[in-house]
Amino acid sequence: MKVVFELSGEHPSLSPSEVIHCLKSEGVSYRYMDIFGSFLLVNIEGRADIKKVSQRLALSHLIDIYLFSTKPYLRHLLKKARKTKVDIEGSFRVRCENRSNKKLRSIDLEKKLGGIYADKHDVNLTNPDTEIRLLLSEELWFVGKKLFEVNRSQYEKRKANFRPFFLPISMHPRLARCMVNLSEVKAREKLLDPFCGTGGILIEAGLIGAEVMGSDIERWIAEGCKKNLRYYGIKGFEIENVDVGEIDIFGKVDAVVTDFPYGRASTTKKEPIEKLYKRAFLSISNVLKNRRKLVCAIPSIELIKIGCDYMDLVEVHPFRVHGNLTRYICIFTK
């Protein structure tokens, strides 16, 4: 079964990478096909539970069953649509997503494509049984059937200012969930955040069923993290007030996901940032199981290089936060 992931477009490399790592974490056999702008085409092998993947994703909007594709012209679209059999159950509507540079009226395309199917099926623009998706990229136009919609509004509801305990500088829940997904952690596996802060990463990991552990050098922050985890119904967590050099108390873990201190607004207890990173990478490499992943946000290329002395760097995604502030989302393996 071919499916199209409608990526959010928030980040050109993070969005498709999240999809691929999500598929792996849920044990979905797949064959990567291609990416066209914000549309990722994947061939799913066998019977896979794509719904679980949709429930994990943060940087996608929709997952569609692929029906056909055409050259990016209306005449090609309508010609192919007339020749291609499309199974429509009950009523339907057509929705167009234009991610190309062409100035086209989506509603006009929806009417023209919908007109082909309207002879045999009822149109329902508000609550259809089937939604036909028309996806416009620069290279190709895709037609598919909506399979699942990613619940992106949930992440807005979990922003830091809605939590019982928060600090001014906190990662957005969408990015936190994305990083958790990049780690390929599965439900009931152990995930550690050694710089847990208010618990944003642990909340997202706990909500997908991971067993979460975290530490912070400040006791009051560690206690605040516990309060947030309880608020979101996360069970069985373990939060300790310890230095990153003491995280071996957690034993071996399946994934480490963390937002490293930046040295300015973050607490380093006046320790030089390079020394802290060396100790952190050493400790993380000692607790992480073999062939598993560390996913981390790091503020500079120079600090990424420190990690390369301890683990293998497999992916780097520059992520501009605002102004001149750029984080690098990195995936290391042991």
What label would you give each PLM region?
Residues 67-72, 122-124, 128:
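Short glycine-rich, low-complexity/disordered patches
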Residues 3, 65-67, 86, 315-316:
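Hydrophobic transmembrane signal anchors and adjacent membrane-proximal interface regions, especially
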